[in-house]
């Protein structure tokens, strides 16, 4: 207990000195060794025993994670490392590498200032490496590089000392190429990774050794020595001379920014308020005496303490009993406990100052992305944007009817813990639908519901999530209210792809100041009058009011937008969500008496005009795609390409590396079910493959009617396809 008590004391002392804090994430492609690295860093810092490190998977504290051997959630831990005779506090988050859990990476990146990017020396940079690096740079998180599994390069691939250095150089060049393409300004500002400068370390997380140029100078161990030790299989001596935690954590402390340095540049990226206000200045300087500004990046459930909100404290200090506001809620909450993480355990402390990662209970209203503050009316932080969208759905039912109320509560909880999961109730069938990033994501959530929440459930076969869209512009369509006293004239047309991208990237939203939003849209090619008339943005669809001087329209616009949102949630063709549509209101006739233009009149009138307009504009479907990357011996390449093309896949690129072929393809998600088994048999089990979200594309007309028919049948809709007149005669 003595050692642990001492550790807690060191952590709580250092919390108060932002110069000596580093908030970092560890990111990588699946199986490149993040969690093993995290565990050995903890062992080096005296948090877990050295013998267990790497096997204990301390950070994978969830049974599901240990059974599957992958990290599913992000884990937090605080530890102390001594560098140049000074103690430093390192708050570390280990993130998942599997594409289905990319949402966790996005959220973790909001909490940290620096990232250790782990790349397997044998496999090199992989698709998920690119994705996590892009997420880090988008959040202005500075990267350093750790090239892992160097021993495999020497012992499995039998490369000589010179070839080893060439291959490691290639990995560094590729990572720099990615940084340069994704963020040229940061690259110019010195964010590239450079072995000579010390921002790259090489080693083996499993065997607990690592080397970097500063480390070589310190220990006198050269690349040649590393090669000889690995060849001789003497990893133990190497680990004694060049301990992993020393090389990596020294690099982190020396090159990654402390909260004060980081927040100077990061605050303006993640917060769009006025930097010259008191709260703006407090956040830019990580001022512990300022108003509280805390961003929630994760919510978990503790069986004893209830909901625990973890996040980054940008200004002010968190103390027990303080009253706070949560964005999106008018009610105040009272903070019950504040604490920090030590692996999966939460340690209570009295006070946590700005610049730290904190865990708080008592914030009933908070969800992931919430801004928690003591300042009423504070501009909230930018919402956290996820790189992928949910593309696969399953229907969930309780096995025993008595569990239904519990299931509803559990689904609400699960959706709160994992914002990349979408839970909806199908009003017509009464089923609960769970949409996620992929098959594995939904499997894990289903297991978790049964295991942690003790509710037995049955799930349907996975169903693909489609989007409805349109192909051409229509004339204005008249929508009449049921009492015939109100009329709206609305036309629909496809929204430009540049504008759709800007909405998805968060560059255009209703939260932006109006003039800034207008200018952005004009720059993207929208006409000035249209940009001025935008009154609603929902998902990737917009509603524009081009009318002039219509009486009572102001007070009914909210209801018109309700009608618009209803259609965008469930389009007329298949009741699937709508994407990339622009609806324009050109005229309206409204009854002068407010009683005759209530919700029951206005919403249906707007809804019908938009539904009919979409059907006249050639309503069509978009289907989700996945990019698939397959590594396979060249001799078996034919089997792999045949398997991909047989699934309506398009081969985008083929390259060779040694005797391996690397195939990059784009395949519809609908065709990807059962792919794992089939690709194994097509390549004698020798293919390595991974996927990432590949966007949406129009369903080929040859199969459109079949798919529409299947969706309508599944949802219990009429077999015959709807016509515009069905909506206008209502």
Swiss-Prot record:
UniProt subcellular location: Cytoplasm
InterPro entries referenced in this protein's UniProt entry, alphabetically: EFG_II, EFG_III/V, EFG_V-like, EFTu-like_2, G_TR_CS, P-loop_NTPase, Ribosomal_Su5_D2-typ_SF, Ribsml_uS5_D2-typ_fold_subgr
UniProt-listed Pfam families: EFG_C, EFG_III, EFG_IV, GTP_EFTU, GTP_EFTU_D2
The organism's place on the tree of life at top rank: Archaea
An example molecular function term from Gene Ontology annotations: GTP binding
Major place of residence: cytoplasm
SMART domains, per database record: EFG_C (SM00838), EFG_IV (SM00889)
Diphthamide modifications at: 596
Chain positions recorded as GTP binding sites: 28-35, 94-98, 148-151
Ranges where the tr-type G domain occurs: 19-228
One GO term of the biological process aspect: translational elongation
The keyword Nucleotide-binding appears for this protein: yes
Keyword Membrane on entry: no
A cellular component term, taken from the record's GO annotations: cytosol
Keywords: Cytoplasm, Elongation factor, GTP-binding, Nucleotide-binding, Protein biosynthesis
Gene3D superfamilies (UniProt xref): 3.30.230.10, 3.30.70.240, Elongation Factor G (Translational Gtpase), domain 3 (3.30.70.870), P-loop containing nucleotide triphosphate hydrolases (3.40.50.300), Translation factors (2.40.30.10)
Family: Belongs to the TRAFAC class translation factor GTPase superfamily. Classic translation factor GTPase family. EF-G/EF-2 subfamily.
Biological role: Catalyzes the GTP-dependent ribosomal translocation step during translation elongation. During this step, the ribosome changes from the pre-translocational (PRE) to the post-translocational (POST) state as the newly formed A-site-bound peptidyl-tRNA and P-site-bound deacylated tRNA move to the P and E sites, respectively. Catalyzes the coordinated movement of the two tRNA molecules, the mRNA and conformational changes in the ribosome.
NCBIfam families, A to Z: aEF-2, small_GTP
Protein name: Elongation factor 2
Species for this entry: Methanosarcina acetivorans (strain ATCC 35395 / DSM 2834 / JCM 12185 / C2A)
């Amino acid at each position: 207990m003595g050692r642990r008590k001492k550790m807690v004391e060191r952590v709580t002392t250092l919390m108060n000195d932002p110069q000596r804090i580093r908030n970092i994430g560890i990111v990588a492609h699946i199986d490149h060794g993040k969690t093993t690295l995290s565990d050995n860093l903890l062992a080096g810092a005296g948090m877990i025993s050295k013998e267990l490190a790497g096997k204990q998977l301390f950070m994978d504290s969830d049974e599901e994670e240990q059974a599957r051997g992958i990290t599913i959630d992000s884990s937090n831990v605080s530890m102390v490392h001594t560098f140049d005779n000074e103690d430093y506090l390192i708050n570390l988050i280990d993130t998942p590498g599997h594409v289905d859990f990319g949402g966790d990476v996005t959220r973790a990146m909001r909490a940290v200032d620096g990232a250790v990017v782990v790349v397997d020396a044998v496999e090199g940079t992989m698709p998920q490496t690119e994705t996590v690096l892009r997420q880090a740079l988008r959040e202005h998180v500075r990267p350093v590089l750790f090239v892992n599994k160097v021993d495999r390069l020497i012992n499995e691939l039998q490369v000589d000392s010179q070839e080893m250095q060439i291959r490691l150089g290639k990995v560094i060049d590729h990572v720099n190429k990615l940084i340069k393409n994704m963020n040229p300004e940061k690259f110019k500002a010195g964010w590239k990774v450079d072995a000579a400068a010390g921002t790259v370390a090489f080693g083996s997380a499993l065997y607990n050794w690592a080397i970097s140029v500063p480390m070589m100078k310190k220990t006198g161990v050269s690349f040649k020595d590393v090669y000889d030790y690995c060849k001789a299989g003497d990893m133990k001596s190497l680990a004694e001379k060049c301990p992993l935690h020393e090389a990596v954590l020294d690099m982190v402390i020396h090159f990654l920014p402390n909260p004060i340095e980081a927040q100077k540049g990061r605050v303006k990226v993640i917060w769009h308020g006025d930097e010259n206000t008191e709260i703006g200045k407090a956040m830019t300087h990580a001022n512990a005496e300022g108003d509280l500004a805390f961003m929630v990046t994760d919510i978990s459930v503790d069986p004893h303490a209830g909901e625990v909100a973890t996040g980054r404290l940008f200004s002010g200090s968190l103390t027990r009993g303080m009253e706070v506001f949560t964005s999106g809620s008018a009610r105040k909450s009272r903070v019950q406990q504040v604490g920090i993480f030590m692996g999966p355990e939460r340690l209570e402390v009295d006070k946590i100052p700005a610049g730290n990662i904190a865990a708080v209970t008592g914030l009933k209203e908070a969800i992931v992305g919430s801004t928690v503050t003591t300042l009423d009316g504070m501009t909230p932080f930018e919402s956290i944007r996820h790189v992928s969208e949910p593309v696969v759905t399953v229907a969930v039912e309780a096995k025993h009817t008595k569990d239904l109320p519990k299931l509803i509560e559990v689904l609400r909880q699960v959706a709160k813990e994992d914002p990349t999961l979408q839970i909806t109730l199908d009003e017509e069938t009464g089923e609960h639908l769970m949409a996620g990033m992929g098959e594995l994501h939904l499997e894990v959530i289903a297991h978790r519901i049964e295991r942690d929440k003790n509710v037995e459930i049955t799930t349907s076969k996975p169903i693909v999530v489609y989007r409805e869209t349109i192909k051409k512009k229509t004339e204005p369509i008249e929508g009449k209210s049921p009492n015939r006293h109100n009329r709206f004239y609305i036309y629909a047309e496809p929204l430009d792809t540049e504008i759709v991208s800007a909405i998805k990237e968060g560059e255009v939203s209703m939260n932006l100041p109006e003039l800034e939003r207008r200018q952005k849209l004009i720059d993207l090619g929208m006409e000035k009058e249209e940009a001025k008339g935008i009154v609603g943005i929902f998902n990737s669809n917009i509603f524009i009011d081009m009318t002039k001087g219509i009486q009572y329209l102001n007070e009914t616009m909210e209801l018109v937008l309700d009608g618009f949102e209803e259609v965008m949630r469930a389009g007329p063709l298949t009741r699937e969500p709508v994407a990339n549509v622009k609806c324009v209101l050109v005229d309206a006739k409204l009854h002068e008496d407010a009683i005759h233009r209530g919700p029951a009149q206005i919403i249906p009138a707007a809804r019908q005009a938009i539904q009919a307009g979409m059907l006249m504009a050639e309503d069509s479907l978009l289907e989700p795609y996945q990019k698939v990357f397959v590594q396979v011996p060249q001799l078996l390449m034919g089997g792999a390409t045949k398997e991909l093309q047989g699934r309506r896949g398009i081969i985008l690129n083929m390259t060779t590396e040694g005797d391996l072929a690397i195939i990059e393809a784009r395949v519809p998600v609908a065709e990807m079910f059962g792919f794992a088994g089939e690709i194994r048999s097509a390549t004698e089990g020798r293919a390595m493959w991974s996927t990432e979200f590949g966007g949406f594309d129009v369903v080929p007309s040859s199969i459109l009617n079949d798919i529409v028919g299947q969706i309508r049948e599944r949802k219990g809709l009429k077999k015959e396809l709807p016509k515009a007149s069905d909506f206008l005669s209502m």
